[in-house]
Regions:
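Transmembrane-helix motifs of polytopic, lipid-linked glycan transferases
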Residues: 78-99, 137, 141
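Transmembrane-helix signature of polytopic, membrane-embedded enzymes
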Residues: 91-114, 132-133, 149-155
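Membrane-interface transmembrane helices that cradle and orient dolichyl/undecaprenyl
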Residues: 99, 138-159, 185-186
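Membrane-proximal stem/loop segments at transmembrane-domain junctions that anchor or position
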Residues: 228-331
């Protein structure tokens, strides 16, 4: 057995030990946590079990189907912890193979598994862990494609497309991912020549068209809107609610109701964000519209407001984009029985959030710098997979900020480790260069 093989096994053992022990401890001491969205996912899961007869289209089917298959909250919690372990091991493999060093692989894996924003989400009955899992598998497949020319077959493209599509059906803000992956893997530079490979384009887009396109067609047939869900109009109001007083008199009833609820929300929370969810029942009662008619109407109103208030819309997009990088941790300190450990965890989370926010800022600066400077690209030895990660994060930050303005910090969670991986690569690139020089001297 070579020294390198021993090192790989040693660091893999360290990663496994830490990841398993952390999740066992979490499962034994911290319960599954429900949020305001959880009940709607459970309702949709019941509809899945009944053959979609009463499926209301408010949620894409990925997470409800997962809940339907797995069952009770505690079982879902355990399953999500298992998914977190698989994600951790995937980062170990990618870090190991990309750098050739098991220490870097272990650092990448532990950066994921020790991030409270990740392991606490594995306890939350929300979509993030499942979305992270499907995205990780899609990126893992893309890594294999880029690093192993012999694997560049249609079947691998289909698997990548399947995972990216399931990520979309779990968290619809990732609807761009199949197209992004297909385009990125289809084009490559050999020397100074741009090469095109049709296999990833066909392989990745085929399951996306069948799964995501098929689902959107189902929504269109049943609810008369071509969208991943029936909530599009409500999400747009998250943007336009800031200037809803400019809604035309034609929709005065909806406008006035929203403004009343907005004022109340600002008094209670200091922000108008998520006002629409409180206002929906009153809007339906006043207009006689059902949930879907109201969503379509609010979408029409919001599109008009955006067209007539482009700079206000842009300012909210930029605000949402900035919030995207804030590295939140969704957890419930009240369920930790021992006050001492709850206090320790609060300190740990504060420190982790500060470090992650700094990492996010470094990511923004270094990706922009690398895009401009050829010298930096060469110095940092940026492989195509690093650019794939960077592009995925940037696209998510922009796309999510355009579509919604409410829980923007939450939108980065599935790709937070991709940001950390990029920054770790920047930090270690000098060491990689020295190792390469040492091998050449030998």
């Amino acid at each position: 057995m070579t020294r390198n093989t021993k090192d790989v096994r040693l660091w893999l053992g360290v990663v496994l030990a830490v990841a398993v022990l952390l999740r066992v401890a979490l499962f034994l001491t911290y319960p599954p946590v429900s949020y305001s969205d959880t009940s709607s996912y459970r309702r949709s899961a019941e509809a899945v079990l009944k053959g979609f007869e009463a499926y209301d289209g408010t949620r894409t089917p990925g997470y409800p189907a997962f809940l339907a298959v797995v069952g009770p909250d505690r079982a879902v919690y355990a399953a999500q912890l298992g998914l977190g372990l698989i994600i951790t091991l995937s980062w170990f493999y990618i870090g190991l193979k990309a750098s050739g060093n098991p220490v870097f692989g272990a650092a990448a894996a532990l950066a994921h598994t020790l991030n409270p924003g990740q392991f606490f989400f594995e306890a939350n009955l929300l979509t993030e862990t499942l979305a992270t899992f499907w995205l990780m598998l899609a990126l893992f497949g893309a890594f294999l494609w880029l690093e192993n020319p012999g694997l560049r077959k249609v079947w691998l493209g289909v698997l990548i497309g399947l995972c990216a599509s399931l990520a979309t059906l779990t968290r619809p803000l990732f609807i761009f991912m199949p197209v992004w992956l297909a385009v990125f893997l289809s084009f490559s530079f050999e020397g100074k020549k741009l090469k095109f490979n049709w296999r990833p384009l066909v392989g990745i887009l085929l399951p996306a068209i069948l799964l995501v396109g098929g689902w959107m067609r189902w929504i269109q047939v049943n609810y008369h809107v071509f969208s991943p869900s029936t909530m599009s109009g409500y999400h747009l109001v998250q943007h336009t609610g800031y200037y809803f007083e400019d809604v035309p008199d034609e929709y005065a009833v909806l406008r006035d109701i929203y403004l009343d609820y907005r004022e109340q929300r600002i008094v209670e929370r200091g922000t108008q964000g998520n006002t629409i969810w409180d206002a929906i029942p009153a809007m339906q009662e006043a207009t006689g519209m059902n949930f879907y008619e109201l969503s379509r109407t609010l979408q029409e109103i919001s599109v008009q407001l955006i067209l007539t208030h482009p700079f206000e819309f842009l300012s909210r997009v930029l605000r949402g984009w900035w919030l995207f990088w804030r590295a939140p941790v969704y957890w419930d300190s009240s369920v930790i029985a021992a006050p001492f450990w709850a206090g320790v965890m609060k300190v740990f989370i504060t420190g982790a959030r500060g470090l992650l926010f700094l990492t996010n800022l470094i990511f923004i600066i270094t990706t922009a710098a690398a895009g401009i400077s050829r010298r930096l690209r060469e110095r940092w030895q940026l492989k195509p997979f690093l650019w794939l990660l960077a592009g995925s994060v940037w696209a998510t930050s922009i796309f999510s900020s355009i579509l919604d303005h409410g829980d923007n910090p939450r939108f980065l969670v599935p790709l937070q480790t991709a940001v950390v991986f990029w920054v770790m690569w920047m930090a270690a690139s000098g060491w990689f260069n020295r190792r390469a020089s040492g091998r050449e001297l030998k």
